[in-house]
């Protein structure tokens, strides 16, 4: 019905005919029911709430009220234009996300998951921090091609939990650590989840630009987690892993061909400057061809395996497609009612024109939205509400979008709702809420990362698209030191237990470095040097082996 007479169909959107109204209502109601079954009750209730807001807009407080729209206008806007169901989110789903999800499935069927696992185990080493380090590296390597926090967590937990358990990690600690690494998969190139493609579409930039922008923040996310792992291993004296892992050379010689498809994807995007669709198709074709280099015939992508991969890819895509179609109803509400501009005005007023205050409000809003919505929906709502205010305050558009994306990812790890920690706890036997708190603990340094690249012009250079190399080096050095200071303050251990005064001072130094202008100035460098001097002093006055402790929940 929709495509029988498309031109006239769109023209009737402001005054739908009875048949338009019937099919439009059916489409919206069916979408809500499918969303309830696949995505969940909470998300569907939020979408329904926005639809009710359109109908009863004049009953809301003055700051967000609007003239109410009748049923015909709502259905016409949501069903008969490119602003609602068939808007940008669903367009991105069909054009880009589908192909990359299928690409990830092809890699999985071809045995790439085993390659990433073997490679991470080969890099673990045999130190006390090796088990935790291996869990984080495995999540980072496996998560990049998967692009899903929960999927990565569920893939890594059964393999890494026995290793972490032998090292001395409690069930809650292990679940929290693996979940923290898994959630970082949504930030990790090349897939990064559906939100990355929405950034590309909303901003009108290339997919390669998005990959470049997220690279350094993603590295900082994992570096902050690794700082926590290394210091915690010192504190609790975890045992080194007992697994007989292959060497990196052995892994690369036997399975390194899995990297070829990623190389082809990057080459098509960068060298030939083609669209993400071409890149995904080229990567899928390369995966099929290189699968025959495997010594295990079960990993060969024969016609039967290709069909299996396509079926599994379609199944994996279903929740994403439904979520993005339903998210179109939320976006349509903002475009019709002007709600985004109203909320932006509220943020401008509440922040008093302060960039830092506006970013804090954006973080709080994202955390609250993330309590009930998945990452992609959280990003969409955060960006339409917050980005206009941030841009008015002078933050570049690409920085505002990446802020919304990063905060949406962090909302997934924040209590009291966290799917990845709960999923990991089901395997380790830990307490779900305790696992969430552990995941939150491991990710605390990462909460500083958005402030690094958004509060100053020097910090913008971390996204590589702006600034110069001197700014980039200075911002990177400052960011790494801040992450280390926060990790030391939280864990409270270096060679021995840190005094509470030093822990507090290190955390204060890290925050001062965030809120003060980064640069060759006293406000920017004083807390940096103060923190470094405290660490050097502690290293000089402490001698002897660290005290053995028991890992606690």
Predicted regions, residues:
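Core transmembrane alpha-helical segments of multi-pass membrane transporters/permeases
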Residues: 33, 38, 48-63, 71, ...
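Hydrophobic transmembrane alpha-helices that form the pore/transport pathway of multi-pass ion
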Residues: 117-185, 204, 375-408, 417-434
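Long, contiguous bundles of hydrophobic transmembrane helices that form the permeation core
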Residues: 212-316, 419-511, 543, 547-553
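Long hydrophobic segments that form regular secondary structure
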Residues: 256-399, 406-407, 487, 496, ...
């Amino acid at each position: 019905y929709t495509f029988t007479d498309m031109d006239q169909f769109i023209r009737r959107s402001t005054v739908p005919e009875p048949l338009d109204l019937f099919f439009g209502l059916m489409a919206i109601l069916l979408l809500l029911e499918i969303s309830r079954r696949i995505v969940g009750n909470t998300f569907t209730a939020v979408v329904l709430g926005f639809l009710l807001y359109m109908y009863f807009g004049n009953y809301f407080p003055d700051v967000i009220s609007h003239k109410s729209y009748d049923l015909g206008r709502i259905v016409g806007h949501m069903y008969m234009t490119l602003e609602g169901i068939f808007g940008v989110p669903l367009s991105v789903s069909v054009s880009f996300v589908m192909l990359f999800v299928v690409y990830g499935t092809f890699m999985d069927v071809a045995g790439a998951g085993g390659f990433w696992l073997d490679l991470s185990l080969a890099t673990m080493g045999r130190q006390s921090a090796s088990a935790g380090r291996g869990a984080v590296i495995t999540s980072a390597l496996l998560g990049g091609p998967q692009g899903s926090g929960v999927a990565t967590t569920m893939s890594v937990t059964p393999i890494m939990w026995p290793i972490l358990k032998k090292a001395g990690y409690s069930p809650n600690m292990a679940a929290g650590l693996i979940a923290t690494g898994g959630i970082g998969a949504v930030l990790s190139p090349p897939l990064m989840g559906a939100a990355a493609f929405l950034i590309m579409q909303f901003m009108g930039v290339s997919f390669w630009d998005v990959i470049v922008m997220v690279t350094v923040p993603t590295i900082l996310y994992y570096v902050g987690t690794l700082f926590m792992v290394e210091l915690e291993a010192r504190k609790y004296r975890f045992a080194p892993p007992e697994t007989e892992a292959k060497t990196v050379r052995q892994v690369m010689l036997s399975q390194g061909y899995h990297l070829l498809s990623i190389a082809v994807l990057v080459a098509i995007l960068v060298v030939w400057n083609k669209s993400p669709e071409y890149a995904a198709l080229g990567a899928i074709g390369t995966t099929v061809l290189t699968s025959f280099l495997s010594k295990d015939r079960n990993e060969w992508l024969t016609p039967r395996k290709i069909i299996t991969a396509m079926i599994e890819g379609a199944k994996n895509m279903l929740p994403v497609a439904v979520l993005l179609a339903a998210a179109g109803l939320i976006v349509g509400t903002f475009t019709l009612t002007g709600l985004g501009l109203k909320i932006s005005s509220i943020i401008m007023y509440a922040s008093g024109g302060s960039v830092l205050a506006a970013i804090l409000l954006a973080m709080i809003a994202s955390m609250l939205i993330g309590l009930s919505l998945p990452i992609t929906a959280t990003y969409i709502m955060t960006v339409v509400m917050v980005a206009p205010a941030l841009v008015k305050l002078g933050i570049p558009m690409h920085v505002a979008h990446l802020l919304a994306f990063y905060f949406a990812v962090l909302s997934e790890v924040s209590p009291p709702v966290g799917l990845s920690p709960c999923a990991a706890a089901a395997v380790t036997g830990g307490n779900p809420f305790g696992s969430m708190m552990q995941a939150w603990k491991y990710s605390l340094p990462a909460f500083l990362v958005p402030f690094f690249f958004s509060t100053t012009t020097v910090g913008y250079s971390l996204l590589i698209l702006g600034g110069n190399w001197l700014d980039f080096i200075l911002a990177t050095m400052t960011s790494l030191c801040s992450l280390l200071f926060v990790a030391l303050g939280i864990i409270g251990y270096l060679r021995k237990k840190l005094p509470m005064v030093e822990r507090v001072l290190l955390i204060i130094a890290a925050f001062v470095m965030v809120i003060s202008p980064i640069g060759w100035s006293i406000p920017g460098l004083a807390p940096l040097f103060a923190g470094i001097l405290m660490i050097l002093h502690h290293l000089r006055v402490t001698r002897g082996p660290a005290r053995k402790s028991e890992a606690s929940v």
